[in-house]
């Protein structure tokens, strides 16, 4: 009869510690890119919707990830990641 292999991988930290660390990092990054009043409003909305639960933590993580992804994708002035078009000179030539 087959047996499942024993877990021989590296020891992982518990889910709740990992989740709170991820939230901390996302919040510190979000503060660099969005007005604090927006983030406060988002936090209030999450708290009113989910209360003080893990579902609320997971929801705010998901929303912050989406906001930051879109922010970088559109083109953040603080980052080299993005889709900002290069400005062309008036005669239409581009430098290559």
UniProtKB/Swiss-Prot annotation:
Complexes and interactors: Homooligomer, may form homodimer. Interacts with p6-gag region of the Pr55 Gag precursor protein through a (Leu-X-X)4 motif near the C-terminus of the P6gag protein. Interacts with host UNG. May interact with host RAD23A/HHR23A. Interacts with host VPRBP/DCAF1, leading to hijack the CUL4A-RBX1-DDB1-DCAF1/VPRBP complex, mediating ubiquitination of host proteins such as TERT and ZGPAT and arrest of the cell cycle in G2 phase.
Post-translational modification: Phosphorylated on several residues by host. These phosphorylations regulate VPR activity for the nuclear import of the HIV-1 pre-integration complex.
Keywords: Activator, AIDS, Apoptosis, Cell cycle, Host G2/M cell cycle arrest by virus, Host nucleus, Host-virus interaction, Ion channel, Ion transport, Modulation of host cell cycle by virus, Phosphoprotein, Transcription, Transcription regulation, Transport, Viral penetration into host nucleus, Virion, Virus entry into host cell
GO biological process terms, semicolon-separated: DNA-templated transcription; monoatomic ion transmembrane transport; protein homooligomerization; regulation of DNA-templated transcription; symbiont entry into host cell; symbiont-mediated activation of host apoptosis; symbiont-mediated arrest of host cell cycle during G2/M transition; viral penetration into host nucleus
Modification sites for Phosphoserine: 79, 94, 96
Gene Ontology CC: one annotated term: host cell nucleus
HAMAP family in UniProt: HIV_VPR (MF_04080)
Subcellular compartments: Virion; Host nucleus; Host extracellular space
Main function: During virus replication, may deplete host UNG protein, and incude G2-M cell cycle arrest. Acts by targeting specific host proteins for degradation by the 26S proteasome, through association with the cellular CUL4A-DDB1 E3 ligase complex by direct interaction with host VPRPB/DCAF-1. Cell cycle arrest reportedly occurs within hours of infection and is not blocked by antiviral agents, suggesting that it is initiated by the VPR carried into the virion. Additionally, VPR induces apoptosis in a cell cycle dependent manner suggesting that these two effects are mechanistically linked.
Annotated source species: Human immunodeficiency virus type 1 group M subtype B (isolate SC)
Cross-referenced Pfam families: VPR
Descriptive protein name: Protein Vpr
Note: HIV-1 lineages are divided in three main groups, M (for Major), O (for Outlier), and N (for New, or Non-M, Non-O). The vast majority of strains found worldwide belong to the group M. Group O seems to be endemic to and largely confined to Cameroon and neighboring countries in West Central Africa, where these viruses represent a small minority of HIV-1 strains. The group N is represented by a limited number of isolates from Cameroonian persons. The group M is further subdivided in 9 clades or subtypes (A to D, F to H, J and K).
Region of interest called Homooligomerization, as start-end residue ranges on this chain: 1-42
Family membership noted in the UniProt record: Belongs to the HIV-1 VPR protein family.
């Amino acid at each position: 009869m087959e047996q499942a292999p024993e877990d021989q991988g590296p020891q992982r930290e518990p889910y709740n510690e990992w989740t709170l660390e991820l939230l901390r990092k996302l919040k510190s990054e979000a503060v660099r890119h969005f007005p604090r009043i927006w983030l406060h409003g988002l936090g209030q909305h999450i708290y009113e919707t989910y209360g003080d639960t893990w579902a609320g933590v997971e929801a705010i993580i998901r929303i912050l990830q989406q906001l930051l992804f879109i922010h970088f994708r559109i083109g953040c002035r603080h980052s080299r990641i993005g889709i900002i078009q290069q400005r062309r000179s008036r005669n239409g030539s581009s430098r290559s």
